Amino acid sequence: MDEKSKLIDRYYDRYFESYFRRFINSFFRFNALPVVYTLGIKYLCNQKLRYMIIETKHLIIRYFQEKDVAGLLEYLSHPRVNCFVGDRLCSVESALAYISNTPKDMLRYAVCLKEDDFIIGDVFALREYTDTFSVGWHFNQRFEGKGLAYEAATEFLDYLFCDAGARRVYGFVEDDNLRSKRLCKRLGMRYERCMKEFISFVCYPDGTPRYEDTCIYAILNKEWTEQREQKPNSLGLCRVVTDMHEMNEKKQ
């Protein structure tokens, strides 16, 4: 292929990419995700969401990078609650796999300090239906007591409702996980019920399963909107949402 043909191909590739991104953005802007799913481009929508970046007063919530491995190992080498035993990372290789092998229906982001981009946790959401997400989070114990988990979770929920088309967001919380229960309440999530001995993640010393009492906390889009209108920008957040393509274009 000669140089002229290569330039023409490159032009059409960039034109198509730009056009397609505007096409997808229009669905997000008008909250038409059910139509998007019907058209069969759910995976492409999740790919767009996956590369979003949220900037708050103290944090950057972004897609994972290889430099996050050390920070990931710091808080996931010894998960503090039983439900995340399966996420335990024991090596650099397992941390790299955690970063690169995010399920297609899951959104998972690194929560990093704005001052030095060091990862202190992550937030994630699994799309279970077109407009329903199950959420969760990990945070480094070393950074507790500063309101950072609340800041990250607040903006993540706002992102799910405003940008990802969520109608309902809920989370499973073990009954003895007091930190997450307090966080859910502070976020305005409604306690719905507690399922006794719902699931087992670990065993007792004698090998018998230890079943956990599991609570459900949830909130609807309309409840979140009403709550945010009553206390607009209560954290003093400077929320900026962008995506990887826009960042690269700005750098160029």
Predicted stretch roles:
Residues 43-80, 112-252:
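Acyl-donor (CoA/ACP) binding surface of acyl/acetyltransferases
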Residues 84-89, 107-113:
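A short, aromatic/hydrophobic, helix- or strand-capping loop or linear motif
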Residues 99-110, 121:
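A short helix-loop-beta-strand connector motif used in the catalytic cores of GNAT acetyltransferases and
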Residues 80-101:
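Conserved GNAT-fold acetyl-CoA-binding loop/helix
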Residues 10, 14, 21-22, 29, ...:
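Basic polycationic patches enriched in arginine
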Residues 1, 8, 24, 35-36, ...:
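Short hydrophobic transmembrane-like helices used for membrane targeting/insertion
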